[in-house]
Amino acid sequence: MPDYALEAAHGGLVVGIDEVGRGPLAGPVVASAVAFTAPPSETLSSLLDDSKKLTARRRMLAYEALMADEQALIGIGAASVAEIERINIAQACYLAMRRALSRLGCTPDLALVDGKHAPKLPCPIKMVIGGDGISLSIAAASIIAKVTRDRLMVRLAVRHDAYGWERNAGYGTAAHMQGLKLRGVTPHHRRGFAPIRNMIEAEAHAA
């Protein structure tokens, strides 16, 4: 379970940053930045973990608790499919992180970033591999980012109902691939990703 040790050891305002949506075939990448102005309560801390390890119900409970917590500063940023295609997925993740941090409302003393490759940020950075299972701030950011992106994909699924995005969040599941065969590529698909690119090229050769 994550804890507040990294934040407490540094002191000052420490923000956790994480992104969601690096691997899907459709939809934007979303990042969140979360900083606590005081150590989170035991009740809130008990809800926080790597968003991928949480059930949908517990993840929503954690999300709602974070959004209601007056001591939690939260910023959310995204990079669009067009931006992913223009600058590549890694740079789009960094762009989403910078946007999330810019919406935090202040400049932190330190950013704890999940992963091993550092983005350019306007503050000192500490990379934390597996950070969403180590730092409460990063875990909180992972939850905010995932719930935000999942909700966006549910909304997109209303207009594009053949791909199962409300269930698979744009990942390349069997249902998603079947939808691509039946309905083809939408403007929300990442054309630079191999499965989509290969499908477009195959259709061009068959024409």
From Swiss-Prot:
Q: Supply the alphabetized keyword list.
A: Cytoplasm, Endonuclease, Hydrolase, Manganese, Metal-binding, Nuclease
User: Where in the cell?
Assistant: Cytoplasm
Q: Which residues bind a divalent metal cation?
A: D18, E19, D114
- What is this enzyme's class at the first EC digit? hydrolase
Q: List, alphabetically, the Pfam families matched.
A: RNase_HII (PF01351)
Cofactor details (free text): Manganese or magnesium. Binds 1 divalent metal ion per monomer in the absence of substrate. May bind a second metal ion after substrate binding.
Q: GO biological process annotations for this chain's record?
A: DNA replication, removal of RNA primer; mismatch repair
Example of a GO MF term: RNA-DNA hybrid ribonuclease activity
Q: Which InterPro entries match?
A: RNase_HII, RNase_HII/HIII, RNase_HII/HIII_dom, RNaseH-like_sf, RNaseH_sf
Return the GO cellular component terms, semicolon-separated.
cytoplasm; ribonuclease H2 complex
* Residues of the signal peptide: none
Protein's job: Endonuclease that specifically degrades the RNA of RNA-DNA hybrids.
Q: Which family does it belong to?
A: Belongs to the RNase HII family.
Q: Which HAMAP family match?
A: RNase_HII_B (MF_00052_B)
Q: What is this protein called?
A: Ribonuclease HII
Q: Which organism is it from?
A: Gluconobacter oxydans (strain 621H) (Gluconobacter suboxydans)
